[in-house]
């Protein structure tokens, strides 16, 4: 059984639904012909690249549902179906790849080069839970998630044109923060059944400049829910 952190699920969601101003990610796809009862499909990113996120999976041209029909094994760059496929079925996996990324499950390191920004990280700052019945019932966890957005001050390599307008520094951090809230409001169903019940904890507040990282900083906070967190079954 693969360990599946809620942060891993959210990283995949954000990488898929938020456009990187620095365009570090490109799209590619792999095609397979399933063997009898095959469940695991290993991806083959371009040499020097690694898996960023899964965009879509089809089996005989029918879309499969992420976290319901299959899960992602990021460490081994695999898509794993919960139920074995039939011999001869055509599987097409479309995914993002890159030599680096910009959305991570860990906090930004102060040693990062300026070209590593903008950067987003995800923190679980609390996770109460309750058993939904007797001792055999599942536990529903309610993680409180904090998403940090880090952007550098205005300089030549930190000004980005988005939709015809230029963004940098605090302005860019705020723009990304609201695109994150929009992504959850518009695409929450992509998280189900792994996570559900998105509930925002206010809109992105103004925060002071971070002297340690020399970055502008915004946060997005919300609650969500999930059963058997950390497990694929």
What is the predicted role of each segment?
Residues 31-47:
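Surface-exposed ligand/attachment interfaces on beta-rich extracellular proteins
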Residues 137-157, 213-228:
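Oligomerization/assembly interface segments of phage tail-like spikes and tubes
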């Amino acid at each position: 059984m693969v360990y599946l952190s809620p942060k891993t699920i959210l990283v995949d969601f954000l990488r898929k639904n938020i456009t990187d101003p620095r365009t570090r990610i490109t799209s590619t796809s792999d095609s397979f012909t399933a063997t009898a009862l095959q469940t695991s499909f290993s991806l083959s990113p371009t040499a020097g690249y690694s898996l960023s996120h899964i965009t879509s999976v089809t089996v005989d041209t029918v879309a499969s549902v992420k976290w319901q029909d299959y899960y992602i094994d990021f460490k081994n760059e695999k898509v794993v179906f919960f139920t074995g496929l039939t011999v001869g079925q055509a599987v097409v996996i479309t995914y993002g790849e890159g030599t680096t990324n910009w959305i991570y499950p860990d906090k930004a390191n102060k040693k990062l080069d300026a070209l590593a920004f903008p950067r987003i990280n995800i923190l679980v700052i609390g996770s109460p839970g309750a058993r939904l019945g007797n001792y055999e019932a599942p536990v529903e966890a309610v993680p409180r998630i904090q998403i940090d957005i880090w952007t550098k001050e205005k300089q030549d390599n930190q000004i980005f044109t988005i939709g015809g307008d230029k963004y940098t520094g605090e302005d860019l951090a705020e723009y990304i923060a609201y695109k994150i809230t929009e992504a959850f409001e518009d695409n929450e169903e992509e998280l189900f059944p792994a996570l559900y019940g998105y509930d925002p904890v206010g809109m992105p507040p103004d925060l002071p400049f971070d002297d340690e990282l020399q970055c502008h900083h915004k946060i997005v906070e919300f609650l969500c829910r999930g059963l058997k967190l950390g497990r694929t079954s």
